[in-house]
Amino acid sequence: MIHVIATVRVKPGRRDDFIELVKSITGQVTEEKGCIRYILTVDIVSGLPPQVLDENLVTMIEAWESLEALRNHLTIPHMALFFEKRKEMVEGGSSLKVLQEA
């Protein structure tokens, strides 16, 4: 199983728009072959160090059956459209961690 943590910095005032964009494709993504989990998350006030609340970060937590399934996910037409639409909402890019269990 492959785990993905993808964090995106959105422009101030665009977080809700970005969340709606992600929600608009979530049903399609979860139906993709090999998708185990596709969860949209945002920061909360936890009071736990070292977390710093950032209202402009959106984090996807994903699980895929294999690296091949993840790679296929990135080539599907609805993802190409998603990446195109998100350009106007994102600032500073994103970070991606692709992990496997130790």
Where are these regions (language model features)?
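Absolute protein N-terminus
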Residues: M1-I2, A102
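Short, well-ordered beta-strand segments in beta-rich or mixed alpha/beta enzyme
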Residues: I2-R9, I39-L74
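Short amphipathic alpha-helical segments
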Residues: R14-L40, H78-F83
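Short, low-complexity, polar/charged sequence segments that are solvent-exposed and flexible
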Residues: S24-G27, N56-I61, P77-F82, G92, ...
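Glycine-rich beta-strand-turn "strand-cap" elements at beta-sheet edges
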Residues: I39-D54, F82-A102
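C-terminal structural segments of small proteins and small subunits
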Residues: L67-E91
